[in-house]
Structure formats: C-alpha cells, structure tokens
Design a protein with these regions (language model features):
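Bacterial Sec-dependent N-terminal signal peptides
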Residues: 1-24
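Glycoside hydrolase catalytic-domain context in secreted enzymes
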Residues: 20-238
C-alpha cells in the first residue's frame, strides 16, 4: 500500500511545482507593455515606487525585479560603452537639414545599442551606459553661443529642431507597429533649458515671454510627444 502512494505523491509534487512556476501577468512576455505595467504597479508599495524614481533603480526581490540603471547616452552614436560608430555632433547633423539621413544614423545607433546591451546583460545586471534607455535627443533651442552644451542641439530654429528630433526618436525606438521598442528615447530638457549652465539649478526661467515660450521653446517637445511618441521626457534643471 505504501509503495502505491509514491507515484501519486510524485504527480502531486510535479503539479504543485508547475503551479508555483506559473507566470504572473506582469511577467508574461506575451502581454503588451501596458498590460504588464498595469498589473505590476498595484503590487508595488509606495516605498518601492519611490525607490525606483531615480536613474539607479534598486532591485525588488520579492517581485523578481532586477536592479536597473536608466542612464545611457547616444547623442551622436552609442556613448561611454566601449567601441561604437561615432557620427557628427548634433549641431553638425542639424546643418544637413536632412531628417531622413538622421533617421538612418539613429537606426544604426539603436542596432548597435541593442547588441551591446545584450552582451552586457550576460553578466546578469545592466550597469550605467549598458541599458536600453537613452537620454537623447536634446531639443533645446541654441540661442546663445556661450552656452556650453549648444553642440548637443540642432540649432536655433524651432521647426528644424522638431523635425530632426522626431527623426532621432523614430530611429532609436523603431517602428511603432513592431510590437516592441528597440529602445527608449528621451526628449530633453523640458523646457527653456538653453543656458546659462553654471547656475542652472537656481536660474529662474519664469520671466520668459509667453509667446516666446509657446512659439520657440515648446514646439519641438510637442512634436516629439504627440507625433513621434517619445517614451521619456527629462525635465529642465531650472
């Protein structure tokens, strides 16, 4: 009689282990990113939500979430992550007035980025400059040549900046009907962040003329969000 119970117990153990391995909705790769996020967010405590609101997001072991470093750069090619194809600075690419060319540049950049991230990910943890979230493009308006980061922009023209910025986003993120994003682009810095750099943490931009704000500084961000569907937006420091 005792021997007869052994196979039954074995089957029960297999079934129980299978139940334990059943994926929760946020772990199910067959669901959309939106569905998985909607399932995951209510499972996070307030403290856990706060902890991941920074570029160095810690792991949440109880939910099987690994630590993640959001900071990565691709201003004119994959940056700070070993060998990569280096393209001209943004101000130079902007001078081409060729948004189709810019799309191809950042389509190639996102290809390299995915390969690099895949290799880096073999270690188990993606460190800074190894993930798939890139803080590019910079769609601020370059009005003052004394601003030390003007070379990151596409110049002083709001329309050109919007066109170039959208090409960058589409090249980095890939086709919207692909079912997944190649990576995430980030529109920065929202908004009126065009210098001075030395006092950026205290500079008061509230004295800007409302017409100048809406006609000069905001159109590119509107283009990237509403037309190119950029996945991230970085706030300004002012």
């Amino acid at each position: 009689m005792k021997r007869g119970w052994i196979p039954i117990m074995g089957v029960c153990l297999v079934l129980s282990f299978s139940a334990c391995k059943q994926l929760l909705p946020y772990q199910d790769a067959s669901l959309t990113a939106e569905q998985r996020a909607e399932d995951l967010l209510p499972r996070l405590t307030l403290e856990e939500k706060v902890s991941i609101m920074q570029n160095a997001s810690p792991a949440i072991p109880r939910l099987g979430i690994k630590e993640y470093e959001w900071w990565n750069e691709a201003l004119h090619g994959v940056g700070r992550a070993g060998l990569a194809t280096v393209f001209p600075q943004s101000i130079g690419m902007g001078a081409s007035f060729n948004d189709s060319l810019l799309y191809e540049v950042f389509n190639a950049t996102s290809d390299e980025a995915r390969v690099k991230s895949r290799i880096f990910g073999e270690s188990g943890v993606l460190k800074r400059y190894q993930g798939l979230t890139f803080w590019t493009p910079n769609v601020n308006i370059f009005r003052d040549p004394r601003w030390g980061r003007g070379q990151e922009t596409y110049g002083e023209d709001p329309y050109l900046t919007g066109q170039m910025g959208m090409a960058v986003v589409r090249g980095l993120q890939g086709p919207e009907d692909a079912g997944y994003d190649k990576l995430h682009a980030c529109a920065k810095h929202f908004a009126v962040h065009s210098g001075p750099e030395w006092n950026r943490h205290s500079f008061d931009a509230e004295n800007i003329d409302p017409r100048d704000l809406w006609e000069t500084y905001l159109p590119a961000f509107k283009d990237l969000v509403q037309k190119a569907h950029v996945k991230e937006v970085m706030c300004a420091y002012n």
